[in-house]
């Protein structure tokens, strides 16, 4: 009787999907960033050795911002990183292992890596800036690397965004009719 139950449990566990496997939408930052990095290496004809890839990844991460910089921090490719698991990226990439598999292995080492998601992009050509929150308006300026000194009210942020839009989002600025 116990053997039958044990067999039933073993069968049930073998049929259920592995919870560690990546689902669609998992590790989106990891997969896209490492995919771009791998393509950049191929385009520049870089030698695929672990040491070279490690050096190139550190250089590539210096340009990273936002969620991609956080990914670089988690894998140890930034100067202020606490842990260093960069070899978990460089060795598999040297053997041309797909980035999805690399991210799956990184997820097992540090689950935070796959929890990173890109922020939702705001379509500036169609959005009504008056309906956005001040936090979202600040985020737009921050993404552009700008600050609004002296802005106290929502209208100040909207005015600043409208001033800078031709510089940072020229297509959106030309598409807007409320200017």
From Swiss-Prot:
Please give the residue ranges the record annotates as the region Interacts with HSPA5: 126-169
Q: Where is this region: Interacts with ERN1, EIF2AK3 and ATF6?
A: 93-155
| A single GO cellular-component term on record | sarcoplasmic reticulum lumen
Q: Tell me the disulfide pairings in this chain.
A: 27-114, 30-103, 61-72, 148-151
Q: Which molecular-function annotation in GO is an example for this chain?
A: sulfatide binding
A GO BP term here is: regulation of response to endoplasmic reticulum stress
Question: Which residues constitute the signal peptide according to the record?
Answer: 1-21
Going by the UniProt record, its keywords in alphabetical order are:
Disulfide bond, Endoplasmic reticulum, Growth factor, Lipid-binding, Phosphoprotein, Sarcoplasmic reticulum, Secreted, Signal, Stress response, Unfolded protein response
Pfam families named in the record? ARMET_C (PF10208), ARMET_N (PF20145)
Reported impact of residue 133 to E: Abolishes inhibition of HSPA5 ATP nucleotide exchange
Please give the function described in this protein's UniProt entry: Selectively promotes the survival of dopaminergic neurons of the ventral mid-brain. Modulates GABAergic transmission to the dopaminergic neurons of the substantia nigra. Enhances spontaneous, as well as evoked, GABAergic inhibitory postsynaptic currents in dopaminergic neurons. Inhibits cell proliferation and endoplasmic reticulum (ER) stress-induced cell death. Retained in the ER/sarcoplasmic reticulum (SR) through association with the endoplasmic reticulum chaperone protein HSPA5 under normal conditions.
Please describe the quaternary structure of this protein: Interacts directly (via SAP domain) with HSPA5/BiP; the interaction inhibits ATP binding to HSPA5/BiP and subsequent nucleotide exchange. Component of a complex containing at least CRELD2, MANF, MATN3 and PDIA4. Interacts (via C-terminus) with ERN1 (via luminal domain); the interaction is decreased in the presence of increasing concentrations of Ca(2+).
The entry sums up its family as follows: Belongs to the ARMET family.
- What is the protein name given in its UniProt record? Mesencephalic astrocyte-derived neurotrophic factor
Organism of this sequence: Mus musculus (Mouse)
Q: What is the lineage of its organism?
A: Eukaryota, Metazoa, Chordata, Craniata, Vertebrata
> What would be the name of the gene that encodes this protein?
Manf
